[in-house]
Amino acid sequence: AMKANKVRVVRGEAKVKGRSQNGIEIECAGETFYAVNLLLCTGSEAFVPPIPGVKEAGDIIVTNREILDLKEQPKSLVIIGGGVIGMEFASFFNSLGTEVTVVEMLPKILGGLDGEISAMLQDIYAKKGIKFNLNCKVTEIRGNEVVYVDKDGQTLSAKGDKILMSVGRRAVTAGIGHENLGLELNRGAVKVDDKMRTNVPN
């Protein structure tokens, strides 16, 4: 469909080099392209916080991307984060028979939802066997063990064949060359106005 509409797709890592007399200069896959207008669509990626032990845990730690590529169903799964994505996977793996434990920093799951709805859903999930540890802050990962502190200051832990990091997402802006155009960022994301325009014309 793209080709039929005279749209060329170039696969590779694109980087903005700056402005020239030919327009905005972009390099990708060994080629240089020029544009009058530039649309940034770099998307977002799962945020993995720098919790001690994360790197050492290796492929025990997964995000919403890697968990879909698993070759074997985990017998147990610890999910760090009780937001929408975390609860989707909690429900899915619970229905397959995986033992699921959710560790959430807030006092409720699905933080953006109405409190009554959140409580109702938590009750439904709990009756299906999902374990919840709310008001808990993760302090360390020890292999397949998630160490956390509860609201009373007690240190506890939960083990899983896999640990799903589901604490949010962040904009992909590293390496795109935004600094070469002077694009302003806001907490790592490209800053835009109410019409999705950046501080740089075009």
Question: Which residue stretches match the model-derived regions?
Answer:
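Conserved N-terminal Rossmann-fold NAD(P)-binding element of oxidoreductases
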Residues: 40, 80-81
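Glycine-/small-residue-rich beta->alpha transition segments that form the dinucleotide
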Residues: 30, 35-37, 41-47, 67, ...
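Phosphate-coordination loops involved in phosphoryl transfer and adenosine-cofactor binding
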Residues: 11, 35, 58, 73-76, ...
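Rossmann-like dinucleotide-binding cores of NAD(P)H-dependent redox enzymes
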Residues: 68-69, 74-78, 84-154
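N-terminal Rossmann-like dinucleotide/flavin-binding domain of flavoprotein oxidoreductases
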Residues: 1-34, 113-139, 144
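Glycine/Thr-rich phosphate-binding loops of Rossmann-like dinucleotide-binding domains
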Residues: 48-50, 87-88, 93, 172-175
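FAD-site-proximal beta/loop scaffold in flavoenzymes
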Residues: 57-73, 162-202
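Short glycine-rich hinge loops at helix-strand junctions in the catalytic core
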Residues: 43, 97, 127-129, 182, ...
